[in-house]
From Swiss-Prot:
PANTHER family in the record: THIOL PEROXIDASE
Gene Ontology BP annotations: cellular response to hydrogen peroxide
InterPro entries: Redoxin (IPR013740), Thioredoxin-like_sf (IPR036249), Thioredoxin_domain (IPR013766), TPX (IPR002065), Tpx_CS (IPR018219), Tpx_Peroxidase_subfamily (IPR050455)
EC number(s) recorded for this UniProt protein: 1.11.1.24
GO MF annotation terms: thioredoxin peroxidase activity
Listed name of the protein: Thiol peroxidase
Protein family membership: Belongs to the peroxiredoxin family. Tpx subfamily.
Keyword Nuclease (UniProt): no
Active site (UniProt): C60
Any Pfam family matching the protein: Redoxin
Length: 165
């Protein structure tokens, strides 16, 4: 069990964040059309998994905006923005913001993702949501970079994630 903070208060996180060199766990999440989306849907592409609690928080929204800008510059790479938000909320946010370069995925029917990727917040006011993390995968789903952000209210290290590509 890892521990991060939320505005300085300790929060327990269940599961193990995939480490560099490891094979990423398979997953099934929910896309904007409510269909199941798996890791295999992105076979042959590099993947940036931007994992966060909710797009309705300022830091999470900022991470989606920043990765959207970067995603437009990346060849053979998809940026997956993964949260517990309903697909409707994710679609509404990206539509209102004009964000078209990221793929939103919900843990709505894929709760096992949270523990398999070591981001399941187990205590505190955000229990049941995802901790903030970034996992970068190559075309064969090997982990190139992973970061569990120590303070949930902080942004991830974008430069380190993008440099891993």
């Amino acid at each position: 069990m890892a521990q991060v903070t939320l505005k300085g208060n300790p929060v327990n996180v269940d599961g193990q964040l995939p480490q560099k060199g490891a094979q990423a766990p398979a997953f099934s999440l929910v896309g904007g059309d409510l269909a199941d989306v798996t890791l295999e849907n992105f076979a042959g592409k590099r993947k940036v998994l931007n994992i966060f609690p909710s797009v309705d928080t300022p830091t999470c929204a900022t991470s989606v905006r920043k990765f959207n800008v970067e995603a437009g510059k990346l060849a053979n790479t998809v940026v997956l923005c993964i949260s517990a938000d309903l697909p409707f909320a994710q679609k509404r946010f990206c539509g209102a913001e004009g964000l078209e370069n990221v793929v939103n995925l919900s843990t709505l029917r894929g709760r096992e993702f949270l523990e398999n990727y070591g981001v399941a917040i187990a205590s505190g006011p955000l229990a049941g949501l995802a901790a903030r993390a970034v996992v970068v995968l190559d075309e064969q789903n090997k982990v190139l970079h992973s970061e569990l952000v120590g303070e949930i209210a902080d942004e991830p290290n974008y430069a380190a994630a993008l440099a891993a590509l």
